[in-house]
Amino acid sequence: MFNISIFHSTWTFGLPVMECWSWRLTRSTRGGAIATLGCTGLGYGKEDKQGPVKEGAGDWLNTLFFEEYGMEGSHMLGEAWAGAITSYLNQFPVDYTRRAFDDTALDAKTVQEWVLLGDPSLKIGGYE
């Protein structure tokens, strides 16, 4: 793809991309994944938060997914994904009255971009 941008932004590392990493893994013509979880854009980490409490963001959400599966007993992919999103928003509620670059906006962006690509009715680990 021809790069027509005049600024090399650190947000995209100066390279526009046509698809997210999760979709790339799923659509692979050499036998893609049956499902993927991941960010559709620039994923944030707790280090990107500005407030005194450095918790949340993508690494927190990933941990919540495995907590849903391993500790809460969510064995269906969509159920574990939805539970992780719900748990994250209960811990980090979004305040839509705040500025766009506050931590609450980062939390909103985190859950909006963390998508499940694939069949949500898949059982994690398969059937016996």
Identify the residue ranges that each predicted region occupies:
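Active-site-proximal C-terminal subdomain of hydrolase catalytic domains
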Residues: 9-128
